A protein has these predicted regions:
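N-terminal active-site beta-alpha-beta segment that forms phosphate/nucleotide-binding
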Residues: 2-115, 119-122
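Conserved phosphate- and dinucleotide-binding cores of soluble alpha/beta proteins
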Residues: 4, 72-78, 82-86, 90-243
Length: 243
């Protein structure tokens, strides 16, 4: 595991974007595993800037996102498709036919999860998987649990997640109660993993993930067993590390 120390969020985003551009330059038709959330926003902005300058070409690049809410159509502004389209895809020259996100509108969970696993397998697997880190150590929607869920599956969102999300919806009944997510095994099959972490509030969980016991109670701790992980964390995220 390589740990790169960044000064702040902007520096983290720039360093992460460097790792992703190196991948795209070395293998233009690579498969990028992508994430949503606040952590990768700056990384996407940096990649867009370099694309606009003519330094990057995504015309052959393919992508597979980690997760999507079940029950939200693509045009709902809370869907992960909407996030990816508006924060990244529409600004670069990636072919939308080469982008993949679980289909939140497929009601049959078993069918959708099997389809998505096959999509990734047919792509030849993910070359570089970008991950953010949840406050409880989750990656994708793989929450702390008694066991690692291996493949793409449907998760029931916790009451606290539903409660936290309700501000984005008209009523609590509109808040999605489930999501589709790549499993821990799906994530671990990526050839390379890039974990980006910013902010003091994630410092303790980052330390546990990188140096604590490997346990499904801290899903990101499984990354210790992957042989090609790059972590880019800012000083705040490293601030509670002992020593
Ligand atoms: C997003 C995802 C989540 C986030 C995590 C961190 O697709 O799968 O695991 O990466 O919740 O979120 P932020 O970056 O918003 O702190």
């Amino acid at each position: 595991m390589k740990l790169y120390r960044a000064k702040d969020y902007k520096d983290m985003s720039r360093k992460a974007a460097n790792v992703i551009s190196a991948q795209v330059i070395m293998k233009p038709d690579c498969v990028l595993g992508l994430a949503t959330g606040s952590s990768p926003l700056g990384t996407y902005q940096q990649l867009i800037e370099w694309y606009e300058k003519g330094d990057l070409d995504f015309s052959e690049t393919k992508s597979a996102n980690l997760d999507e809410y079940k029950g939200l159509p693509r045009d709902n502004d809370q869907s992960y498709y909407y996030f990816m389209y508006n924060n990244f895809f529409k600004h670069i020259n990636i072919d939308l036919n080469n982008t993949n996100i679980p289909n939140g509108m497929e009601p049959d969970s078993a069918k959708e999860c099997a389809r998505y696993e096959k999509v990734i397998a047919d792509l030849g697997g993910v070359d570089l998987q970008l991950l953010g880190l949840g406050h409880n150590g989750h990656i994708g929607f793989n929450e702390p649990d008694a066991a690692f869920e291996k493949i793409t599956h449907c998760v029931d969102l916790t009451e606290s997640t539903i409660e936290a999300n309700k501000r984005f919806f008209a009523t609590i009944d509109d808040v999605p109660k489930q999501a589709y997510t790549m499993g821990i095994g799906t994530i671990m099959r990526a050839k390379k993993i890039l974990l980006i972490v910013s902010g003091e509030e994630k410092s303790s969980i980052l330390y546990k993930a990188l140096y604590g016991p490997v346990t499904p109670q801290v899903p990101a701790s499984i990354l210790q067993l992957h042989n090609d992980v790059v972590v880019v964390a800012d000083e705040a995220a490293l601030s509670k590390f002992p020593g």
